[in-house]
């Protein structure tokens, strides 16, 4: 198994500074972790490891879902992890982290819902979606990398965290999505440039590491454009993902972004986005976004029943927003349009939508011929570490039975979000609390079929999250 090997490698890195033999006499105190004496010579490797940084994270996540005509589904997850990063030596440093998750209590997450015959969607995502029966052995080696950093250049090789428009953390569960590969960054005061090659993914709600093609299809696969179940899981071929990007500062508080994602043998996505940033002297802001997608070869498999991106389709997305900061408040209106030429496709295993109209709890990936209208408001307290985020959106989707434009058979819906965050101070410094509630209301025909509304619409969802960082 690869997993034990990776943990062995991580252990080697953490213990590399030990000089003691591992054999212990039976009458000796255990010395497996070596001596604790601080090394004074800053030129050697031992000093660099001893002067490294350690970050700890404890997390509690309660989740419950209220579906129409159904019992409440719930889960309480708890977990913790450690991250270590050595002090640089010749501009090189090493990082490693791991995390465990435990199912403290939950409703039945193993058997399909009795009305829709589908597995739980939200609560199961706190654990391992590939093994719903696993409640205790949920652990993952998350980061294991070597990093070169000098002046404005950073190059990271190995398992790492990445946050870009197309591949991102999507950290709305216990643990985020992680990637493996090489990632380089150049940053100066106004501009940032990125480039990398990725060949492994460990998606949110999983514990293993998967090759690029294997990682696509771990989540729900939806349907083909003719309405038959998509068959691309374990049927795709791809060597990896090439990702490049740039963020360039323009005059008068404007920023433009360019991103291109090349998924070998499957599809290519390009994004251009320009944003005017708010300032005290100019509190108004706006943004424009365009995304284009084209199929590569046969979309991953020449068999149309097993392809990820059907060769007959392409997609174009246009987005816009306009907002104003007013004292402690920030208000915006947002719009997204996906054209009729095809579905906007992006493996959900790799991250959330980059659209201005994204609201926590749902995505529009897999849709074509979509119009989304969203209002967002944010309140930041002056004298308290308190943020309140609110959102309301109308998502005009194609009919559920228009399979060519509606991959997951989702009804048009209204969504209402409330997200409250508080960072404790004083004695409780390090603790953070978050309360989330959203409700989705179907506004078009669900054909009285539970599989079209269970965990999709006519439902509410509640989260209470506690984090302790140390």
Where are these regions (language model features)?
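Outer-membrane beta-barrel "beta-signal"
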Residues: 456-470
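Transmembrane beta-strands of outer-membrane beta-barrel proteins
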Residues: 52-58, 94-96, 155, 193-195, ...
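Transmembrane beta-strands of outer-membrane beta-barrel pores
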Residues: 60-64, 98-104, 150-152, 159-164, ...
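Outer membrane beta-barrel
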Residues: 85-116, 131-211, 248-254, 333-337
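Solvent-exposed loop/turn segments connecting transmembrane beta-strands
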Residues: 69-73, 138, 169-176, 200-204, ...
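N-terminal periplasmic/intermembrane-space "pro-region" immediately following the signal or transit peptide
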Residues: 2, 6-72, 83-86
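Residues on the lipid-exposed face of transmembrane beta-strands in outer-membrane beta-barrel proteins
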Residues: 80-86, 144-148, 182-186, 244-248, ...
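Outer-membrane beta-barrel translocator/channel fold
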Residues: 103-110, 194-241, 283-355, 362, ...
């Amino acid at each position: 198994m690869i997993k034990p090997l990776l943990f062995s490698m991580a252990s080697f890195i953490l213990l590399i500074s030990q000089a003691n033999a591992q054999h212990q006499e039976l009458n000796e105190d255990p010395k497996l972790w070596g001596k604790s004496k601080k090394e004074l010579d800053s030129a050697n490797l031992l000093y660099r490891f001893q002067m490294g940084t350690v970050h700890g994270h404890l997390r509690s996540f309660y989740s419950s879902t209220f579906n129409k005509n159904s019992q409440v589904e719930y889960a309480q997850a708890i977990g913790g992890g450690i991250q270590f990063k050595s002090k640089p030596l010749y501009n090189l440093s090493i990082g490693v982290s791991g995390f465990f998750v435990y199912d403290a209590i939950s409703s039945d997450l193993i058997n399909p819902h009795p009305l829709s015959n589908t597995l739980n969607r939200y609560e199961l995502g706190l654990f391992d979606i590939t093994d719903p029966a696993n409640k205790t052995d949920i652990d993952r080696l998350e980061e294991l990398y070597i990093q070169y950093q000098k002046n404005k250049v950073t190059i990271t090789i190995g398992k790492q965290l990445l946050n870009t428009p197309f591949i991102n953390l999507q950290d709305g569960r216990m643990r985020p999505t992680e990637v493996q590969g090489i990632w380089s960054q150049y940053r100066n005061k106004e501009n940032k440039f990125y480039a990398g090659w990725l060949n492994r993914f460990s998606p949110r709600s999983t514990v293993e590491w998967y090759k690029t093609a294997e990682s696509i299809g771990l989540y729900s696969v939806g349907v083909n454009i003719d309405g038959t179940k998509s068959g691309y899981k374990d049927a795709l071929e791809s060597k990896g993902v090439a990702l490049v990007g740039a963020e360039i500062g323009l005059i008068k508080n404007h920023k433009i972004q360019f991103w291109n994602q090349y998924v070998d043998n499957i599809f290519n996505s390009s994004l251009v986005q320009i944003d005017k940033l708010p300032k005290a002297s100019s509190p108004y802001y706006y943004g424009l976004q365009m995304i284009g997608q084209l199929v590569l070869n046969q979309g991953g498999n020449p068999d149309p029943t097993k392809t990820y991106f059907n060769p007959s389709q392409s997609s174009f997305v246009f987005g816009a927003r306009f907002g104003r900061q007013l004292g402690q408040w920030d208000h915006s209106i947002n719009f997204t349009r996906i054209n009729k030429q095809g579905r906007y496709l992006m493996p959900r295993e790799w991250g959330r939508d980059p659209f201005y109209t994204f609201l926590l709890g749902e995505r529009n990936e897999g849709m074509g011929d979509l119009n989304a209208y969203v209002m967002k408001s944010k309140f930041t307290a002056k004298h308290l570490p308190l943020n309140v985020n609110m959102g309301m959106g109308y998502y005009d989707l194609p009919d559920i039975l228009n399979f060519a434009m509606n991959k997951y058979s989702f009804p048009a819906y209204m969504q209402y979000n409330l997200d409250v965050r508080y960072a404790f101070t004083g004695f409780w410094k390090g603790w953070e609390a978050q309360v989330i509630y959203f409700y989705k209301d179907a506004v078009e025909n669900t054909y009285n079929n539970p599989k079209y509304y269970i965990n999709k619409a006519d439902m509410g969802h509640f989260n209470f999250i506690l984090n302790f960082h140390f």
